């Protein structure tokens, strides 16, 4: 984590007291935007936990989301090797871009960013089904209406079909079945108020444990 002592040691002389800051989604890895910060905006960001920039066009401090409410919650930040730019990891609330897209670089999605968006769509369908019933019938909504037993059954079925496709050495079939398995696994995780990020964190822990032994 970048502390006050460390950010005061950044190279502020290169760009007239400003540092370019790359904003990245802390879970999906999607690059959201580029902004500029001075020492005052960094101090406010550290104090409030929400990203504040220095606007070059307005010539003042600018809290991201001050008018739209689409703020950027600070998760972590890192200087680059030359200490003249920043990578800031955030959890965005709402759209980041003023054009109502998740990223100002839309639609430059990485593979994992797509997976994160798919998970968000599944979550929306789950919440809508929970609060309004299955008014807008879809396969995902039908699964949530059926309940955990049906969802778990589908994960088991798709897992078996994935294994059989692998044994048959059919690459196309394996990709198809693995896609079905991952989709139904995401549905299951969302049903239990979990997500793929939780799985990744567990894998990180296991990886660290293996390195120690």
Curated annotation (Swiss-Prot):
GO biological process: L-histidine biosynthetic process
Keyword NADP assigned: no
Main location: cytoplasm
Region (Phosphoribosyl-ATP pyrophosphohydrolase): 115-213
A molecular-function term among this protein's GO annotations: ATP binding
Catalytically driven reaction(s): 1-(5-phospho-beta-D-ribosyl)-ATP + H2O = 1-(5-phospho-beta-D-ribosyl)-5'-AMP + diphosphate + H(+); 1-(5-phospho-beta-D-ribosyl)-5'-AMP + H2O = 1-(5-phospho-beta-D-ribosyl)-5-[(5-phospho-beta-D-ribosylamino)methylideneamino]imidazole-4-carboxamide
Lipoprotein as UniProt keyword: no
Pathway: Amino-acid biosynthesis; L-histidine biosynthesis; L-histidine from 5-phospho-alpha-D-ribose 1-diphosphate: step 2/9; Amino-acid biosynthesis; L-histidine biosynthesis; L-histidine from 5-phospho-alpha-D-ribose 1-diphosphate: step 3/9
Alphabetized Gene3D superfamilies for the sequence: MazG-like (1.10.287.1080), Phosphoribosyl-AMP cyclohydrolase (3.10.20.810)
EC number: 3.5.4.19, 3.6.1.31
InterPro entries per the UniProt record, alphabetical: His_synth_HisIE (IPR023019), HisE (IPR008179), PRib-ATP_PPHydrolase-like (IPR021130), PRib_AMP_CycHydrolase_dom (IPR002496), PRib_AMP_CycHydrolase_sf (IPR038019)
CDD domains assigned: NTP-PPase_HisIE_like
Any one GO cellular component localisation term in the record: cytoplasm
NCBIfam families assigned to the protein according to its UniProt record, in alphabetical order: histidine_hisI, PRK02759.1
Protein name as annotated: Histidine biosynthesis bifunctional protein HisIE
